UniProtKB/Swiss-Prot annotation:
Name of the featured protein: Uncharacterized protein TP_0777
Lineage: Bacteria, Pseudomonadati, Spirochaetota, Spirochaetia, Spirochaetales
Organism in which the protein naturally occurs: Treponema pallidum (strain Nichols)
Length: 74
């Protein structure tokens, strides 16, 4: 069985099921709590940004993931 740690909070993900308990973004494995926290921070930014594009969103999301990894918190 594979032991998995969230790259942001370093918490172990038990019984790791992809797309349920953790997500993989590029080279980062992110737990559900950290992913939700990042989405909550992005939501107000997305609502005010016009026009919306998927490339812009992915850039913003990955920027927040990378900042979370370096700061050890989402």
């Amino acid at each position: 069985m594979k032991t998995l740690q969230c790259d942001i909070c370093r918490k172990e993900v038990d019984n790791s099921l992809p797309e349920r308990l953790y997500w993989t973004f590029r080279e980062y494995d992110v737990c559900e709590d950290c992913k939700e926290s990042i989405e909550d921070k992005l939501r107000p930014i997305i609502r005010t940004h016009q026009p919306y594009s998927q490339g812009w969103y992915e850039n913003q999301f990955m920027g927040m993931v990378q900042r979370g990894v370096s700061n050890r918190r989402p």
